[in-house]
Amino acid sequence: MTAIYSNAKNWLVQADLLAKSGLTDLIAGKDSGAGYGKAIIGDFSIMMPAAYSLVRNRNIMHHETISKDGAWVRYVDGTRLDLKDVQFFWGSAALAQSDHTLLHEDKAKKAELALESILADLAVLNIPDGVKLSISLSNHNPERWADEIKRRVEGTHTFEHLHPVTRSIVTKTVEIVVTGIYPEGFGSIAHCLFGEASLVLDPSELAIALDIGSSTWLITVFNGSGAVIDRHLIEGGAGELHSMIAEALDKRNDKVSLLSKDVKHSPSLVNQGIIEGTFTYGGNHLTGKKFETEYSQCLDQWWSNRIEKFANFVTAGNYLDRAKYLVAWGGGVSLPVVDQNLADLGCVILNNPQFINALGLKLLTQISIGA
C-alpha cells in the first residue's frame, strides 16, 4: 500500500526506512503537474512545488538544505555530462531563492528539467545507493517532448544531497529507465479503470472526469476501454483562487502594524493557510490575519464561473445523460466547500486525489515491465 505522508515527522521516519530498506529496484510514476509535482516511488509518495533555482555562486558555504518538500542537489557525474558539477535547488528550497523558475510559467521546462525534478524527489525520499528506478512520466505534449525527456532522464546518474536525518552530504548513484511518457491525465484513467479505484465501466459506457489542478480545470470524457472521447480545458485552477484571495487581502484596510503596511499578499501563503485549516495568512502576529470571509466570497465567484462552463461542455456534447460516473481528482477537489459541492453533484471523489495520476503512472510502469 502506498504511504501518503503529510508532515515532517512522518517524512523523516520514511526517509530513514527507505535508506535502510536494502531495495535495489524501485517502480515509479511521476506527474510533473503545474503548481506541484507528484510522484509515487515504490511505496512512498512525494509532492513538491514545481520550482527550480540554479546555484550560480559555487563559492557560497552552507547553502545545502533538505525538507519534506524541497532540496539542494549537486549532479556529480553520469550520463548527463552537461550537468556535471551543476548544483540546484528544487521545490520549497527553490522558492526561497530570489531567482527561481516556476515550471507552470514555461511548459518546456517540464521536459528540460525532468531529470532534476526526479533527482530532487529521490533526495527527499533518501533512496538507497545503487537503485534501479523504472518510471513512467506524464507530459502535456508527448508527441513534441517524449524523445527529449527520455534522452535527458534515462541513464546512470551520480548526485549529492543532504541526508534528511544525519544532515551530512551523501552521494547516491541511480540507474533510471523510462518505461513510458503519457499524455496528462492518462495515468488517472488507468488508476480509475485498472487500479485501486476500479470503476466498473463497460467499453461502451462513459465516465466524465474533472481534474481541478493548480492552473486549470480539465474535463475528460473516457470509456471503459480507457479511450479518451473528448477533452475540455477551463483556465484558472486552485492557484487562481489563491491569487483572488491574496488580492482581496491587499484591499483590506486593517493594517496590524507599520511593518505590514502596503504588504503584497502571497498566494502561496494563502494556500498554506487553507492546507493547515487555519484560514490564517502568515505565521506571526505581525502579519497573521484571518481570511475566512475572503475565502467564502472568492470561492463563490471562482466556483460558479467554472462550474457553469463545466455544465455547458458536458451537456452540449450530450455526455452528462450518458455518463455512468462523474469522478473528480486533483488537489483542488479537496478544497473546503469544493469537496461538498462536488459530492452534491454526485461526483465520486477518489482517495488521495492529488496523487491519482502518479498512482496510475506507476501502475503503467508495472504493466510495462511485467511486475
Q: What kind of feature is each model-predicted range?
A:
Residues 250-298:
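A mobile "lid/hinge" subdomain adjacent to the ATP/sugar-phosphate binding pocket shared
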Residues 1-207, 227-234, 277-371:
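Nucleotide/phosphate-binding catalytic cleft detector across ATP-hydrolyzing
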Residues 31-33, 209-211, 220, 239:
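Aspartyl protease active-site motif detector
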Residues 185-187, 213-218:
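A short mid-domain helix/strand-loop element embedded in enzyme catalytic domains
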